[in-house]
Curated annotation (Swiss-Prot):
Name of this protein: UPF0316 protein SERP1448
Topological category with respect to the lipid bilayer: Multi-pass membrane protein
Keywords of the record: Cell membrane, Membrane, Transmembrane, Transmembrane helix
Organism per entry: Staphylococcus epidermidis (strain ATCC 35984 / DSM 28319 / BCRC 17069 / CCUG 31568 / BM 3577 / RP62A)
Top-level taxon in the UniProt lineage: Bacteria
Family: Belongs to the UPF0316 family.
InterPro entries: DUF2179, DUF5698, UPF0316
TM segment ranges: 8-28, 40-60, 66-86
Length: 208
């Protein structure tokens, strides 16, 4: 600690790193608490307080220089970004994506089920007539992949995504096949759909 205190640039670096770590844990703990992951949030809060006790005393006793104040503020802002990025990478929980489409002939519900998603669909009516509405459950890490998939199948589809607070009952979570979701790529979707159509067509011909 004495070596750091004697070198102003080491002090700036120490203040920046300590505050990045502290605010990263603080941001993650806040997000996890809001999402209901209480036990994970408790572990993160332990790390947060540990950094606070060990390092923040050094930081707060060295804010008499302008460069230290700047390092403290910069570390705070970077810590928020880092904490949010880590939480995004962890992608805990599920996302519900609502899709409204007028293209009944595409059979989007079954196409998405074949790709591994849990889908509930029903008919609705808008200004321009009948529409098909789908509620699609997906792990958060595959949310963008699902949206790209829907856009490839129906570029005119109306899409809304939100994160459910709690999930209980039904077959949604069991209906999500994570291995299937991981196996395909949206840009290869046309090949997958064509293959399904070929297989379905050949089986129908054999039955006839």
């Amino acid at each position: 600690m004495s070596a750091i205190a004697q070198n102003p640039w080491l002090m700036v670096l120490a203040i920046f790193i300590i505050n990045v770590c502290y605010v990263t844990f603080l941001t993650m703990r806040t997000i996890l608490t809001l999402k209901g992951y209480r036990y994970v949030a408790a572990v993160v809060s332990f790390m947060e307080v540990l950094v606070y006790v060990v390092g923040l005393g050094l930081v707060m006793s060295s804010l008499d220089q302008i460069q230290n104040i700047f390092a403290y503020a910069l570390g705070f802002s970077v810590g928020i970004i880092v904490g949010m990025k880590i939480e995004e990478k962890l992608a805990l929980g599920y996302t519900v994506v609502n899709v409204t489409s007028s293209e009944y002939e595409l059979d989007l519900p079954n196409e998405l089920r074949n790709l591994g998603y849990g889908v509930t669909h029903y008919e609705a009516f808008g200004r321009d007539g009948s529409r098909m509405v789908m509620q699609i459950l997906t792990p958060r890490k595959y949310e963008l992949k699902l949206m790209d998939t829907v856009k490839n199948l129906d570029p005119k589809a109306f899409i809304i995504a939100y994160e459910p607070r709690n999930i209980h009952g039904g077959f949604w979570v069991k209906g999500v096949r994570k291995r299937k979701l991981k196996a395909y790529e949206p840009e290869q979707l046309e090949v997958v759909v064509d293959h399904e159509e070929i297989v379905g067509g050949s089986s129908n011909e054999q039955k006839v």
